[in-house]
Amino acid sequence: MSQYKMHVLVCAGTGCHSSESNLVYEMLRDEVDRKGLGREVQIIRTGCFGFCEKGPIVKILPDNTFYTQVKPSDAREIVDEHVIKGRSVHRLLYTDPETKEHVLDSKHMGFYKKQLRIALRNCGTIDPENIDESIARNAYQALGRVLTEYSPQETIEIIKRSGLRGRGGAGFPTGLKWKIASRNDADQKYVVCNADEGDPGAFMDRSILEGDPHSVLEAMAICGYCIGATKGLVYIRAEYPLAIKRLKTAIAQARDYGLLGENILGTGFSFDVSMKYGAGAFVCGEETALIHSMEGKRGEPSNKPPFPAQSGYLGKPTNVNNVETLANVPVIILKGADWFSAIGTEKSKGTKVFALAGKINNVGLIEVPMGITLREIIYEIGGGIKNGKKFKAVQTGGPSGGCLTEEHLDTPIDYESLTAAGSMMGSGGMIVLDEDDCMVSVAKFFLGFTVEESCGKCAPCRIGNKRLHETLTKITEGKGTQEDIEKLRNLGSVIKDTSLCGLGQTSPNPVLSTLDNFMDEYLEHVHDKKCRSGQCRSLLYYVISADDCIGCMACKRVCPTHAISGEKKEVHVINQEICIKCGACMEKCQFDAISLLKDYPRVAEAINN
């Protein structure tokens, strides 16, 4: 790369790709070639920069100019102004929301200031389909060092001392997991990379595979050396076509370079990787269900013991780690256990990648040191709540996580603190909610997902969650009672205590955490038949104003349930008992005589007046 004077990096992650970053890349390349600059300026497709809210992203080196929301039509101006004349295109620069000033370098953006990219270190920096660029960024150096300088047990001890824990949700110590697998003798062992990522809205693992697949392949080979495995399998959901494409390319390139396959680097160690495709079932994030799916069986969890490290894929000892966990391994080997363990908290070392979403200004992929607070993530990295709304809650840990309140904003991000607060780390989903969100409806939404994703093997999860969802539906429809609230708490606790796997054991978390933190909303739904956020349609009331209605009958004609009565040129009335809250009457009324109320007492008052 040294022969080029300038490098233009174009984000080619799935998010930017869907916003035509591929056309941006092609237009920039064509424009550079047209100007005869192909020998001086290199156009590179990279992985995700993380700032998905502002994509497509284009970054120009060596001056680190960061352009946002670039369109294909902007390519000529970027080449003419920046590449040729050395002048920034100001209209494409990021604008600081507070100072309203343009920011040239991403290092000075609030979104990036508190991030520390370890697992994402190469995403947005290299072409993931070019192994030479990965090698230039130290890819496979850790594997070479391990194979030539360390024994398997010495390598495991490095991972143990680093304090690396599983990033897939449970947080089990990675070094200990490898040690257990290494102690079980067998004629064949397996290393499995869990790239299924079944959480809705989560894209941490996908982005790593799209942006830096060689870091994962290298880590799998290191793990294979440590536990005595010669075969690796990547279990990836078929819905990740770009990640699959780049991973296939990376595997082929690594084989060509002698970094996978027989006799790696002439050391006598052999290890190869193949891929298995999943259908995206959430339950297959659980390692025994994942293994069953890989074997062509139904994706159902099984009782432990035996653990996969004892009897896993095809009955052989199997080590399962997720993508983010593995991506940390090579850099730990190169920089040392002490370096990694100095980052984070006493029990949670290193960094964590989160998919930041919801009612927040800066939606995207972030990587932060363990111990950073929710407040710092939401207000400094995330840029605060959209449209000046008031913060209400943050849901962490995916669909099985808990909803935390403003009182929890100073909670540090680590496994123990989030669990103590009533939520969990999970794989890294983080959804911010504002004042317009109904917490009862939110709990119902997430529970609806786990009901659909339950494998059905154990009764507490299969039946219990369905009963929970039915009870929440009853409450959001204005038919709930005080007994229903007690039922939610009691049944949720039973499901947590008696379910077979992590899906069932954590599935009641959205319900139990909202009961703990937002009981007033449940009571309003049950006793006042009111949804303060206006999200529960059955608790909304359309009312016709006697002062404004002229009796044109337009609303009456469009009502599908004949809930509106009244004669021509007389005030009309809506029968609340049979109104289905479709809103057709309000859309049809040309005199603004129909209003939508959230409070039933106000409905009675409006009718009486």
Would you name each region that the model predicts?
Residues L93-S162, L314, N321-G336:
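Flexible inter-domain linker/hinge segments
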Residues V10, I126-E129, S134-Q141, V191-D205, ...:
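Gly-rich Lys/Arg/Thr-decorated short loops/hinges at beta-loop-alpha junctions or inter-strand turns
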Residues Q115, I244-M370, G382:
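Hydrophobic alpha-helical positions that pack around
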Residues C16, A139, I159-A181, G280-H292, ...:
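Conserved phosphate/anionic-ligand binding catalytic regions in large, soluble enzymes, centered on
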Residues G350-N362, V368, R532-I580, A584:
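C-terminal accessory/binding modules appended to enzymatic or scaffolding proteins
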Residues V32, A219-A221, M370-K386:
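Short amphipathic, charge-patterned alpha-helical segments
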Residues K54-V58, P460-K466, I544, A554-V573, ...:
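Iron-sulfur cluster-binding cysteine motifs and their immediate structural context
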Residues M1-H7, S21-R45, P62-R91, A142-I159, ...:
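Ferredoxin-type iron-sulfur electron-transfer modules in oxidoreductases and energy-metabolism complexes
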